[in-house]
Regions:
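Structural alpha/beta core scaffold segments of enzyme domains
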Residues: 1-172
């Protein structure tokens, strides 16, 4: 897809299927298969709507790579661009376009994930220990900062398991 988000209006594979050497052309409408490691939410090929730039909408099997490339160039796709969600904070706003409108219906790894249907929150975990307000009131210093990781990060900071104790002499 050349769009960050769009409705798929039409896919015409007629010319690609007619090309000599093409064995099969498949679109998302013909392949109702979802995949996902923790939340089974991604179609192998987009169905009805694309949710990110470059999302595949068709696949070609052919006698050679050259024929497959020619066939993909013959596939006609008509899109209706939709407003994309471009920032994670924007995605959390009320009324933001839903990346996954059927979030509550997906199969997911229940021991670890708690999706919030009707939002863009695929997992919400609430951890509370002790009285935070009391802890802040008793603290000599309270430092507030916002920390972020890149959107694709295989080693997140895991702040929910970090404990730090500051000792005299600037030691942690």
């Amino acid at each position: 897809s050349p769009h960050a988000r769009a409705r798929i209006v039409r896919i015409d594979t007629t010319r690609a299927r007619a090309l000599t050497g093409v064995r099969a052309v498949v679109t998302g409408d013909e392949l109702d298969v979802r995949v996902g490691l923790y939340i089974v939410d991604k179609y192998v090929l987009a169905r009805g709507e694309v949710r990110h730039y470059g999302e595949a909408v068709a696949a070609v099997a052919a006698d050679s790579l050259e024929i497959a490339r020619r066939a993909t160039d013959m596939i006609e796709v008509e899109y209706e661009p939709l407003p994309p969600v471009l920032h994670h904070m924007e995605a959390l706003e009320e009324g933001a376009p839903l990346v996954h409108p059927k979030l509550g219906e997906y199969e997911y790894f229940k021991p670890a994930f708690t999706p919030r249907p009707g939002t863009n929150i695929a997992n919400h975990t609430r951890l509370r220990k002790g009285d935070v307000d009391k802890g802040f009131a008793a603290s000599e210093w309270v430092i507030e900062r916002e920390y972020t990781n890149p959107s694709v990060q295989h080693v997140p900071m895991e702040t929910h398991v970090a404990v730090v104790e500051w000792k005299s002499g600037d030691q942690v």
